[in-house]
């Protein structure tokens, strides 16, 4: 079961950038729970985090497989990424854009991390069975 960071926890950024490459290996379910944790931020700024994927590093596309909404505050933000329709995706990488406006320094500052955890096939089966009964 995959449990890894697309962006290491408490990474500090002041400009747009990319996280390290994450090799997906042999996923059982091809469904990931992505957790964006913003542990530090200043006022009047935003961050947008998207997840890019492909067969290998040169094959990572420009269009995201998933994107968190534009965020402004500290907190934990979950997002499910279903890769069943993208069988060629073997590696993932996080990309972020930051922006700051208003008074004071115009340099944005965020401290955050993005964790990817594989959702177990058993849990997916249980949820699917529960949905059919409802």
Task: For every predicted segment, state its role.
Residues 1-14, 21-24, 62-69:
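Local beta-strand/beta-hairpin segments that build beta-sheet-rich folds
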